Swiss-Prot record:
This is Small ribosomal subunit protein bS6. The keyword NAD does not apply. The gene is rpsF. One of its GO terms (biological process) is translation. It holds the Pfam family Ribosomal_S6.
Amino acid sequence: MAETKYEVTYIIRPDLDDAAKTELVERFDNILKENGANIIDSKDWQKRKLAYEINKYNEGLYHIVNLSAEDDKAINEFDRLGKINNDILRHMIVKRED
């Protein structure tokens, strides 16, 4: 079965300190790896102003993960846990064509 490439972008609360942010990113990278994903790269993008207020925040820290996976198990688990984590304001998962 061929691996599918994905891009995961998520917005982290801006008031999270550096240690907590690093721990959050590592935890979600490990969730992807433990569920069969191969992480190509995981990087901070930048702190950006949001188009609209989310949970009383006007800005957020963007993080991007590029990965490949044979099935959608890792993506589904990330989606499930991303929805219930209060430190992640929003997340988006896109299937890449390249």
